[in-house]
């Protein structure tokens, strides 16, 4: 390709493509970044989030490279917004928990012990917890003196001239 054709090709290719090929200092690229920074800080009425230029992931709002943490780290960008992480290794978390446990009074159960389970109430075999009741449609809600109330409601619909039956069940404690 001669120089004139190369220049025409470069002008016809969007600046984002050139920036990925290493032309991040191109004036159009800088202008695009400045415009994006104004959109982020200003007030287009969206959610305010910025997408990563490479993969579309959520980018940090203060990232000057407009990239997600993974892209900034993998491309070696010096980015102050992605330096600090909230993730703490498990060993450090355990050390911190042990330090807090020695400072605070021992109100928790020792490790490995659990709260004892409550015993079930054994009901006599003669009592029945299942009650079948036919609820008339016009009477409203039926009141029963049992632990559980099971309701079964049948619904009949007319759809395209055919009756369709549906059943709804509910259990109330």
Curated annotation (Swiss-Prot):
**Annotated spans, Disordered:** 100-121
Q: What main location does UniProt list? A: nucleus
According to the UniProt entry, its GO molecular function terms are: DNA binding; DNA-binding transcription factor activity; metal ion binding
Keyword annotations from UniProtKB, A to Z: Activator, Auxin biosynthesis, Auxin signaling pathway, Developmental protein, DNA-binding, Metal-binding, Nucleus, Zinc
UniProt: Zn(2+) 1 binding residues: 52, 63, 68
GO BP terms: namely: auxin biosynthetic process; auxin-activated signaling pathway
- In which family does this protein belong, per the annotation? Belongs to the SHI protein family.
Q: What is this protein's record name?
A: Protein SHI RELATED SEQUENCE 8
**Source organism of the structure:** Arabidopsis thaliana
What's the encoding gene here?
SRS8
């Amino acid at each position: 390709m001669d120089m004139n054709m190369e220049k025409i090709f470069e002008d016809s290719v969007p600046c984002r493509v050139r920036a990925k090929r290493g032309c991040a200092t191109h004036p159009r690229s800088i202008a695009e970044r400045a415009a994006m920074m104004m959109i982020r800080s200003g007030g287009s009425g969206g959610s305010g989030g910025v997408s990563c230029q490479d993969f579309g992931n959520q980018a940090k709002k203060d990232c000057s490279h407009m990239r997600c943490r993974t892209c900034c780290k993998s491309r070696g960008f010096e980015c102050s917004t992605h330096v600090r992480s909230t993730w703490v290794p498990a060993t450090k978390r355990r050390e911190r928990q042990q330090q807090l446990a020695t400072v605070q009074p021992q109100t928790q159960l020792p490790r490995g012990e659990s709260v004892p389970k409550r015993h079930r109430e054994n009901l006599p075999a003669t009592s029945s917890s299942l009650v079948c009741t036919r609820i008339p449609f016009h009477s409203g809600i039926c009141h029963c003196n049992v632990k559980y109330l099971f309701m079964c409601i049948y619904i009949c619909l007319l759809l395209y001239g055919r009756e369709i039956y549906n059943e709804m069940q509910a259990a109330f404690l």
